[in-house]
């Protein structure tokens, strides 16, 4: 007989494992790319698709019924075509970019505009600390797929470094 060494959270006490398996498995083939997941994704140069698996990530779309419920972190897969990326931003939690396929140019930036960039390939990552301006651009010849994790179950939407983007950072949520 197996012994669970840690207690289940209250909402899973007594729930059959068949139901747990159904609720906590996410399959890429069942995910629809969300090309409007972020406010900056409306702008040429920042177009990308989010595939949400665990929670909403930095999109703010916390009511998505197709995702695995998030408690302490989120996990998404991003698809970015050549010449696209995202706007410089910060988060109130750590954010990780982990490249699965293709190449991604990631950057960190200070408040004076000084920017350092490095290229990540498959199975390489960057962990972006809280409050550090960061972002990415696909400057390669092919598309990139990468995993994004945020260190909170319901993080805030992106804290864009650009004042105008920041003022309207939640506008994409009202359009839904």
Language model features with spans:
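Short, solvent-exposed loop/turn segments that connect beta-strands within catalytic domains
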Residues: 66, 111-115, 142
């Amino acid at each position: 007989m197996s012994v669970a060494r840690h207690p289940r959270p209250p909402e899973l006490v007594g729930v059959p494992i068949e139901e747990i398996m159904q609720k906590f498995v996410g399959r890429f083939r069942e995910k629809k790319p969300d090309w409007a997941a972020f406010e900056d994704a409306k702008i040429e140069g920042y177009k990308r698709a989010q595939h949400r698996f665990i929670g909403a990530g930095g999109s703010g779309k916390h009511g998505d019924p197709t995702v695995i419920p998030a408690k302490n972190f989120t996990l998404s897969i991003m698809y970015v075509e050549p010449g696209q990326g995202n706007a410089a931003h910060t988060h109130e939690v750590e954010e990780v970019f982990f490249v699965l396929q293709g190449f991604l140019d990631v950057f960190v930036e200070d408040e004076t505009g000084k920017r350092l960039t490095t290229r990540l390939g498959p199975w390489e990552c960057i962990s972006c600390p809280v409050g550090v301006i960061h972002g990415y651009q696909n400057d390669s010849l092919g598309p990139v797929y990468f995993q994004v994790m945020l260190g909170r179950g319901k993080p805030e939407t992106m804290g864009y470094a650009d004042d105008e983007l920041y003022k309207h950072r939640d506008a994409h949520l009202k359009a839904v």
